[in-house]
Protein backbone atom coordinates (compact mmCIF):
# COMPACT_ATOMS: atom_id res chain seq x y z
CA UNK A 1 0.00 0.00 0.00
CA UNK A 2 2.89 2.34 0.71
CA UNK A 3 4.20 1.88 -2.81
CA UNK A 4 0.87 2.99 -4.32
CA UNK A 5 0.71 6.16 -2.23
CA UNK A 6 4.35 6.90 -3.09
CA UNK A 7 3.59 6.48 -6.80
CA UNK A 8 0.52 8.71 -6.48
CA UNK A 9 2.55 11.37 -4.68
CA UNK A 10 5.25 11.19 -7.36
CA UNK A 11 2.63 11.57 -10.08
CA UNK A 12 1.08 14.55 -8.29
CA UNK A 13 4.51 16.15 -7.85
CA UNK A 14 5.26 15.61 -11.52
CA UNK A 15 1.92 17.13 -12.56
CA UNK A 16 2.48 20.10 -10.25
CA UNK A 17 6.00 20.65 -11.66
CA UNK A 18 4.72 20.53 -15.24
CA UNK A 19 1.83 22.88 -14.44
CA UNK A 20 4.06 25.41 -12.67
CA UNK A 21 6.55 25.34 -15.56
CA UNK A 22 3.73 25.82 -18.09
CA UNK A 23 2.33 28.72 -16.06
CA UNK A 24 5.52 30.62 -16.84
CA UNK A 25 4.92 30.20 -20.58
CA UNK A 26 4.21 33.49 -22.41
CA UNK A 27 0.61 34.20 -23.37
CA UNK A 28 1.23 34.15 -27.12
CA UNK A 29 2.54 30.58 -26.88
CA UNK A 30 -0.45 29.55 -24.77
CA UNK A 31 -2.77 30.91 -27.47
CA UNK A 32 -0.94 28.86 -30.10
CA UNK A 33 -1.22 25.80 -27.83
CA UNK A 34 -4.96 26.38 -27.51
CA UNK A 35 -5.24 26.60 -31.31
CA UNK A 36 -3.38 23.29 -31.68
CA UNK A 37 -5.65 21.61 -29.13
CA UNK A 38 -8.72 22.95 -30.95
CA UNK A 39 -7.46 21.67 -34.33
CA UNK A 40 -6.70 18.21 -32.94
CA UNK A 41 -10.07 18.11 -31.13
CA UNK A 42 -11.83 19.00 -34.38
CA UNK A 43 -10.00 16.18 -36.19
CA UNK A 44 -11.02 13.73 -33.47
CA UNK A 45 -14.61 14.97 -33.67
CA UNK A 46 -14.59 14.29 -37.42
CA UNK A 47 -13.23 10.79 -36.76
CA UNK A 48 -16.05 10.09 -34.31
CA UNK A 49 -18.60 11.43 -36.79
CA UNK A 50 -17.20 9.19 -39.53
CA UNK A 51 -17.31 6.17 -37.21
CA UNK A 52 -20.95 6.85 -36.29
CA UNK A 53 -22.41 8.01 -39.62
CA UNK A 54 -20.11 6.41 -42.17
CA UNK A 55 -17.44 7.57 -44.58
CA UNK A 56 -19.65 8.14 -47.63
CA UNK A 57 -17.95 11.23 -49.05
CA UNK A 58 -14.54 9.83 -48.09
CA UNK A 59 -12.55 12.54 -49.86
CA UNK A 60 -14.43 15.17 -47.83
CA UNK A 61 -13.63 13.32 -44.62
CA UNK A 62 -9.96 13.05 -45.57
CA UNK A 63 -9.86 16.71 -46.53
CA UNK A 64 -11.30 17.79 -43.21
CA UNK A 65 -9.03 15.63 -41.11
CA UNK A 66 -5.92 16.50 -43.11
CA UNK A 67 -6.82 20.17 -42.87
CA UNK A 68 -7.03 19.95 -39.08
CA UNK A 69 -3.89 17.88 -38.68
CA UNK A 70 -1.92 19.99 -41.17
CA UNK A 71 -2.98 23.20 -39.48
CA UNK A 72 -1.98 21.78 -36.10
CA UNK A 73 1.45 20.79 -37.43
CA UNK A 74 1.97 24.24 -38.94
CA UNK A 75 0.92 25.85 -35.65
CA UNK A 76 3.45 23.72 -33.77
CA UNK A 77 6.10 24.91 -36.22
CA UNK A 78 5.00 28.50 -35.58
CA UNK A 79 5.24 27.90 -31.83
CA UNK A 80 8.77 26.56 -32.18
CA UNK A 81 9.85 29.57 -34.25
CA UNK A 82 8.20 32.19 -32.02
CA UNK A 83 9.49 30.74 -28.74
CA UNK A 84 12.10 33.12 -27.32
CA UNK A 85 13.94 30.31 -25.52
CA UNK A 86 14.59 28.42 -28.76
CA UNK A 87 18.18 29.07 -29.77
CA UNK A 88 17.85 27.89 -33.38
CA UNK A 89 15.51 30.68 -34.51
CA UNK A 90 16.99 33.67 -32.65
CA UNK A 91 17.50 35.75 -35.80
CA UNK A 92 14.04 34.92 -37.20
CA UNK A 93 11.50 37.56 -36.25
CA UNK A 94 7.97 36.70 -35.11
CA UNK A 95 6.51 38.60 -38.07
CA UNK A 96 8.47 36.44 -40.50
CA UNK A 97 7.43 33.27 -38.66
CA UNK A 98 3.77 34.32 -38.80
CA UNK A 99 4.06 35.18 -42.50
CA UNK A 100 5.51 31.71 -43.13
CA UNK A 101 2.63 30.20 -41.15
CA UNK A 102 0.02 32.09 -43.17
CA UNK A 103 1.65 31.25 -46.51
CA UNK A 104 1.97 27.55 -45.65
CA UNK A 105 -1.65 27.48 -44.47
CA UNK A 106 -2.71 29.04 -47.75
CA UNK A 107 -0.84 26.39 -49.74
CA UNK A 108 -2.21 23.62 -47.49
CA UNK A 109 -5.79 24.73 -47.94
CA UNK A 110 -5.40 25.22 -51.69
CA UNK A 111 -4.23 21.61 -51.92
CA UNK A 112 -7.14 20.48 -49.74
CA UNK A 113 -9.66 22.41 -51.85
CA UNK A 114 -8.17 20.78 -54.94
CA UNK A 115 -8.53 17.38 -53.29
CA UNK A 116 -12.23 18.04 -52.64
CA UNK A 117 -12.81 18.27 -56.36
Swiss-Prot record:
Write out the topological domains of type Lumenal: 55-57
Q: Which InterPro entries match?
A: DAD/Ost2
Q: In which pathway does it act?
A: Protein modification; protein glycosylation
Give a yes or no for keyword Endoplasmic reticulum in this entry: yes
One Gene Ontology term from the biological process aspect of the record: protein N-linked glycosylation
* Gene Ontology CC, one term: oligosaccharyltransferase complex
Cell location? Endoplasmic reticulum membrane
UniProt keyword annotation of Endoplasmic reticulum present: yes
What does the protein in this record do? Answer: Subunit of the oligosaccharyl transferase (OST) complex that catalyzes the initial transfer of a defined glycan (Glc(3)Man(9)GlcNAc(2) in eukaryotes) from the lipid carrier dolichol-pyrophosphate to an asparagine residue within an Asn-X-Ser/Thr consensus motif in nascent polypeptide chains, the first step in protein N-glycosylation. N-glycosylation occurs cotranslationally and the complex associates with the Sec61 complex at the channel-forming translocon complex that mediates protein translocation across the endoplasmic reticulum (ER). All subunits are required for a maximal enzyme activity.
Name the protein family: Belongs to the DAD/OST2 family.
- Name listed for the protein in its UniProt record: Dolichyl-diphosphooligosaccharide--protein glycosyltransferase subunit DAD1
Q: What is the lineage of its organism?
A: Eukaryota, Viridiplantae, Streptophyta, Embryophyta, Tracheophyta
Amino acid sequence: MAKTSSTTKDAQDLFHAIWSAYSATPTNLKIIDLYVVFAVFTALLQDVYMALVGPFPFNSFLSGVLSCVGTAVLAVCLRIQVNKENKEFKDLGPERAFADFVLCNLVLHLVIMNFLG
